[in-house]
Amino acid sequence: MKYFPIWTEKLVPFQFPSLKEDLRTEVVVIGAGITGVTTAYLLAKKGVQVVLLEKDTIGRGTTGHTTAKLTIQHGLLYHELIQHFGVENTYRYAKSQTEGLTEIQQIIKEESFDCFLQQDDAILYTNDTENAKKLEMELDAYHQIGIDAKIIESLPFDIPYISGITLSQQAQFHPLIYLQGIVKVLQQMKVPIYENTLAVDVVNEPQL
């Protein structure tokens, strides 16, 4: 039995050609998932000449199989980052994540994408005593870098639970509707897009 992400239901995939000839551009963006198409969009909006390449078809990779959450919370991460890179660098990382979250929501608003964007809390929880201690360390790491998180006493659904931390002002959305919306804007901006085009190497050559 094959399983398909719910995001792909009722969405008609794009059909872009593969790249078969040489071309010249200022920037090549490799990969047409959320990161790639958003990067191409932001560059094109700044007037940069961009080409977007995808080795498969758009939406078939990580983006098509995502959990669809927009959050700066990525598992038990910040305590580890502080241990390895210090408070200041971890703060910078968290700041970049917050800016990315804001940027995506701003794009959705500016382009009027109906991609079911919804503000929500992000919850990290466990039903294991040892992991509950790790959650306490993660919460302490949050507070060291100015992230406003808190312990929650219960979950909004009935599953085994010992401890959890929550972040407010996070979000969720339909990732492929967002992706398709950005791609349509890129088409309007005349950005060349190629599917089934594998980038195999990057060669540094002297500039003429």
What are these regions, as identified by a protein language model?
Residues T67-I72, S168-Q169:
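Short, hinge-like loop/turn segments at secondary-structure boundaries
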Residues Q73-I152:
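Dinucleotide-binding Rossmann-like beta1-alpha1 core, especially the glycine-rich loop
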Residues M1-V27, K45:
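Extreme N-terminal leader/targeting segments of oxidoreductases
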